[in-house]
Amino acid sequence: MSESSTFTTAVVPEGEGVAPMAETVQYYNSYSDASIASCAFVDSGKDKIDKTKLVTYTSRLAASPAYQKVVGVGLKTAAGSIVPYVRLDMDNTGKGIHFNATKLSDSSAKLAAVLKTTVSMTEAQRTQLYMEYIKGIENRSAQFIWDWWRTGKAPA
């Protein structure tokens, strides 16, 4: 595993009486190192992902170049909504291309696994690379994506 740096930032939600959530930010040298770390983070508590229950997660952020495209995997709730556990995001304000992960057994525990080299890219370069990554998971099952991201290697 390549070296990574870790930072914790407090994210304070709006509203009274709500405890702040902390997001751990870690920097990785490669896409596969970041994806492996993200999946390991999701499974790092007492609960583990049952990949047979995974569904694809589609971006709902209209400002994203990946709007309405598959960007990750999650689980469907009883109410029918999809909770993402690992998704690939892009940020032009400091995190570049990164995986967002939520621990399955503690939804307040969050990880941003940043692809270090993408932070200093121009917005155009970053967007192009991000869309190449998104194209790579297009038309793939949630199980395929999970196995790829969990191991760092696309299933045969």
UniProtKB/Swiss-Prot annotation:
Its cofactor is Mg(2+). GO terms for cellular component: vacuolar lumen. Monomer. GO terms for molecular function: lyase activity; magnesium ion binding; RNA endonuclease activity; rRNA endonuclease activity. Highly thermostable. Has a melting temperature of 78 degrees Celsius at pH 7.4. It catalyses: a 28S rRNA containing guanosine-adenosine pair + H2O = an [RNA fragment]-3'-adenosine-3'-phosphate + a 5'-a hydroxy-guanosine-3'-[RNA fragment]. Residues 1-21 form the signal peptide. Belongs to the ribotoxin-like family. It comes from Cyclocybe aegerita. In contrast to most ribotoxins, activity is completely inhibited by EDTA. The strong larvicidal activity of ageritin makes this protein a promising candidate for novel biopesticide development. Its EC number is 4.6.1.23. The active site is at 98. Fungal ribonuclease involved in fungal defense. Highly specific and highly toxic fungal endonuclease that cleaves a single phosphodiester bond in the 28S RNA of eukaryotic ribosomes at a universally conserved GAGA tetraloop of the sarcin-ricin loop (SRL). The damage of the SRL inhibits the binding of translation elongation factors and halts protein biosynthesis, ultimately resulting in the death of the target cells. Shows antitumor activity. The keyword Ligase does not apply. It is found in: Vacuole lumen. GO terms for biological process: killing of cells of another organism. This is Ribonuclease ageritin. Glycans are attached at residues 100, 139. Disulfide bonds: none annotated. The keyword Signal applies. Keywords: Glycoprotein, Hydrolase, Lyase, Magnesium, Metal-binding, Nuclease, Signal, Vacuole.
